[in-house]
């Protein structure tokens, strides 16, 4: 399984909901605000907003919070003016890390992100230093334990007809890759067949991975945790290849 989707699944399982929910709702609200500001407040006409609202609902964010965030984005309600910014750098072992942030103070966020990199044996780089190693794609994974009696050939045909670019299967999971434009159509095709999806995001997929082990791997995971935990950081992507068992415990 791709490192990022595996990381996301494990992070979801390990999260202590009561502690994380407030921070998660804040990040989901930011995405809705920026999406509505960028493309208008109607999810039917704004793909990015539609995806943000769906993700918020999947995480049990109250409808009142969602509506309030949309109105802040369209200007109906007063709110912060968030700016989108990306940061790039390297973690221990030469792992490439790319992250998206939304902030009302770029200088503060840059300083704090740099500090997190430095204290975890990484370094924040210049714009473009690792972006070329990633492609923005739709990524859907299916946990085979949750999808018993699945016919993989039929599934491959279904996703190909819906526009999927790639279909990979191993002992534990199925991974489907799409363009960002075809992601929603492929996801809906699977959901219409009631296929349980363990991960479904438009994400950044690395073109190659870096194997890290032992203490170095633990340092990479610690860096990932701290970056993801920062209030202004929305998404963190990396090209590490770390053993599943270490990610489960690390």
Swiss-Prot record:
Compartments reported by the entry:
Cytoplasm
Q: GO:BP terms for this protein?
A: regulation of DNA-templated transcription
What are the entry keywords?
A: Cytoplasm, DNA-binding, Transcription, Transcription regulation
Q: Name one GO cellular component term.
A: cytosol
Annotated Gene3D superfamilies: 1.10.10.200, 3.30.70.980
Q: Give this protein's Gene Ontology molecular function annotations.
A: DNA binding
- Identify the InterPro entries for this entry: Integrase-like_N, TACO1_YebC-like_2nd/3rd_dom, TACO1_YebC_N, Transcrip_reg_TACO1-like, Transcrip_reg_TACO1-like_dom3, YebC-like
Coiled-coil segments on the chain, per record: none
Entry keyword DNA-binding: yes
The keyword Amino-acid biosynthesis is annotated on this UniProt entry: no
What top-level branch of life does the organism fall under? Bacteria
What HAMAP family does the entry give?
Transcrip_reg_TACO1
Question: Which family, according to the similarity comment?
Answer: Belongs to the TACO1 family.
Q: What is this protein called?
A: Probable transcriptional regulatory protein Nther_1800
